Amino acid sequence: MLQHYYMKLLLLIRHLELQGGLQLCCVMRNREQKHYRNNNYILNKHTKSALKPVNEASNSTLTKHKENKKQKVQAIVQATDQSLISREAYQSLATIEHKLPCEYLISSEKIQINKEMEVVIPIKLINMQTTRVDIGFYEEPHIIDEEIVNQMVSAIGKAGCRSIKDILKYIVLKLNNDGVLNATCSIINLRISGDGRNVGRKVKQVMVMCTILDDRKNLHFPNKHFTTVLYPGNEDYDSLKNAMALFLKELHELKEFGLEINDIIWQFNFYFSSDWKFLCICLGFNGANSKHFCPWCETSKDERGRLETNWKMTKTMEQLNFDYTVYKGHQQVPLFNMIPLDHWLIDELHVITWCYCKEMDRIKVKFQFWKEKGKGSENWNYTSLMGEDKMKVLKEFNLGLLFSPSRAIKIRELWNKFSDLYNDLHNDNTNPDDFEKSAKEWLALFLLPSKGNWIVGEEIISGLYLPSEITPYIHVLVYHVADMMRNNKKWGLKAFSCAAVEKKNHQHVSYFFRKTLKDGGVCKNGTSSIKELLYYENRVLYYNNTNTLYFPNSQKIYIR
């Protein structure tokens, strides 16, 4: 018993020592201050001059402290959004590092930003009239995660949308102040794009976005492409027409009347860019495998090998609006019929990708397959190459391993010339006339015929490709890309790349339709995922337009 009281006494003494020590530290710190109080004023210790009343100083300091704390919380919200850090992940970080604000402060600030932004840019959910899901058997799934697939399926029948007018009213003022837009020449060049992601073999995630072409330095950032429409379902004409009803109506109004923002009426030039499938759907046109396959000219599959014919962009949107049946292959009125046809551009990335993918298939480049680890797993995975990797394979692949020396030399010449076209396509200073000439020379080499007659004993020298192997993308590369360069010289074809659009769609699907990575795991269905995604889009606009946020970029240091 005596030992017990002795231990309690020691603890009490220790507590008093700590308490007294803390008080002594406070006294010493106060004595060392350079300012002290006198007659309700803060006085400078050296000059004795009054600075400001105590109550004003306290309020000012408190206000500044609150502002700094709020800015820090907003910066953390911004960081978690940009890095796609979930609530659960942040909770774990805050548990480890006590200096981080509590998770509830971050969530509360995020909710507050959502409320503020929904007043400015409301989010609307609409019922889709068609919910039929039909993904082609040969289409490759972009996302195969079962949880994401199930979340997407649960959201079928709903679409989310935001008003393009509301978005423009929110962002134009800052763009004008930053010098991106010019109020004295009140014209906005608006580019529209779309993309469909295959989520398993059950559903697609379709997104329609806009970006400001005038904001050149930011065109390749996904967050500078503003989502106006998104829905899980089918990537077809009827579904898009239903989901984009409000968007199409507003585009017609912008084209006809412009948009008044702060007493300035802004006029609009519209452009459209996407992959081949999405473009043809929006144009009400045949697919790439049809006899009449070109959206811009009236060529057909039977005429692909006629090198003497110079196919030009002869179709017009005016004629399509008057009677689309005049042009073979057009089956419905174009959805974006307010955009001139010479402002419809194919994504330069897909032009290149489909050309060299065909060659890689032909030369039968092999990749390694392996079985995924895991108990009872029957899934197989495989290596895949991105665009630059594929180009490197074709450029450096030893063709002599597959072909005779003479044929290997021809194929190497063909793909070296294609590499030159690839580089010219990405160069804004490329002369369209020179590109057109080089592209036609490349096509002539592509169609190099075989020589010799075995019947009379002549040696057979194999050619390269047949006219039937000219794909729609090759046709566009040779006959229409030069015209696209001429018509859009102000921007350059790189400005119409859809890489950022596809990246954004893939990231959003991977994150917002994985219920365990959002809302603390309480997301119940895909419909709420649609709203969460558009809330995120609104917050991105908030970050871009709020100058008070300070979110420093990380820097990489290289040590040699």
Where are these regions (language model features)?
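A structural signal for the principal folded core domain
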Residues: 1-560
